[in-house]
Amino acid sequence: MRQRTPFARPGLLASAALALVLGPLAASAQEQVAPPKDPAAALEDHKTRTDNRYEPSLDNLAQQDVAAPGAPEGVSALSDAQYNEANKIYFERCAGCHGVLRKGATGKALTPDLTRDLGFDYLQSFITYGSPAGMPNWGTSGELSAEQVDLMANYLLLDPAAPPEFGMKEMRESWKVHVAPEDRPTQQENDWDLENLFSVTLRDAGQIALIDGATYEIKSVLDTGYAVHISRLSASGRYLFVIGRDGKVNMIDLWMKEPTTVAEIKIGSEARSIETSKMEGWEDKYAIAGAYWPPQYVIMDGETLEPKKIQSTRGMTYDEQEYHPEPRVAAILASHYRPEFIVNVKETGKILLVDYTDLDNLKTTEISAERFLHDGGLDGSHRYFITAANARNKLVVIDTKEGKLVAIEDTGGQTPHPGRGANFVHPTFGPVWATSHMGDDSVALIGTDPEGHPDNAWKILDSFPALGGGSLFIKTHPNSQYLYVDATLNPEAEISGSVAVFDIKAMTGDGSDPEFKTLPIAEWAGITEGQPRVVQGEFNKDGTEVWFSVWNGKDQESALVVVDDKTLELKHVIKDERLVTPTGKFNVYNTMTDTY
């Protein structure tokens, strides 16, 4: 285990086209700013920035028109058109760090009481040059024109516009049941192998593709919300739930002769997460979805998506005990041990265990964890929930059987982004769960077996380098001896187009770094235009093949590449004009059973 070299690249991920991941990355809440002495000094001070980069995360709020507020004395007024342009830029590029209401998140607050003291010239310089502490150099990188920089400096001197709330009235107005439960099949009407079906996000098309895991045939393409973030399965495997970044939920009945959306609802303006009840006796009973804006979650009927209970997540931060107006809902999982949903609340640093047995008398266990909670998954026993507080480089462990915090561990890396993580049995350490990192090239292993390996439980046991920084997902399967790590957001095309593969059986645990094999996935896809990025390995049901998305621009060719897990050789390339910006892939069986 050695100290890793941070991963840094000015201007990386500035484009909203790369907004795949959930939530902000910049750790600039601790940034101390001072007005630059002169332009040359400012350029020198701000020419680079840290690996904790901003990631656009509120791209749908950017589409809402709002009226420009009045300007106070000494501040230039903006027309409605100018204000809406600035609002669009802010929500696409700034709100993920600085908050919807500009009250700060991982980035500093930008409310007028603060920005007016700094003044137009300072704001203009800071937006132009950025800072080493995480603020992107929007001007010198070319992401914003000089005119847009001036516009944004002026915009920050005005009062922020609050997006509309989204309550029961709005949800019920959006709620549609296309096929009533009594009109649906009583048994599977198609001959699809549903357990080996893949739901593939076609991000910029606002669709998903359903692909046969054996024949690689695209069985169907269905319209959904914009930029589907995840697909989740009901406990029975019958219903597929998908949620778009625009807050739209589609419920798809896979038993129908032609699987189709049987119910839909919109739960907010920005959203990322959905899950269904899995506790024995409660299978398929409820679904839950969480929103970024408004900050809330809603519990819905599992057969119709009828909204039953909306709960706001606004409240006090766990550490400073200060009120936060917009703590976003990040990952949601269903407990296998209790009739509870596990809800990550990002900015307050709280994990909520929501008991769904009595919605009229809702009981919630609130666990103080760590701020900026993002994604995570269950260990191999399904008892323990391990989640990343990415801006604080921590892993949090929750015992879902006892409903208690178990541990908080620093990963030793920068900005962990595990997806749902990877469970495997290490030759030396026993059962472990792994995460890769966005901010550096490291992979960290935490012990997960308090009974069989108590000395290793809930400790970071090893850290070793993979291909490079910018990883989004790490993956293995119980039937595989390999661990796959992508580097999707790395600026180097050769790295972002490849994956690292580690032989688990060859891991020694003696402090030496395990070797890895590089698979040139993008090269295998035969795509020559753009800079296709390889993202998220997903296994088939049996763990004999692993699929990767080769993600390119909306108007460029993309593909899916299938790798033979035994030989690590190319097995198949899926290309089709309907595969527009494929990103996340979700095998029905693995998703239904939390196999990862």
From Swiss-Prot:
Its main location: periplasm. Residues 163-596 are annotated as: D1-heme domain. Residues 1-29 form the signal peptide. Residues 30-76 are annotated as: N-terminal tail. It is found in: Periplasm. It comes from the Bacteria. It is an enzyme of class 1 (oxidoreductase). This is Nitrite reductase. It comes from Paracoccus pantotrophus. The gene is nirS.
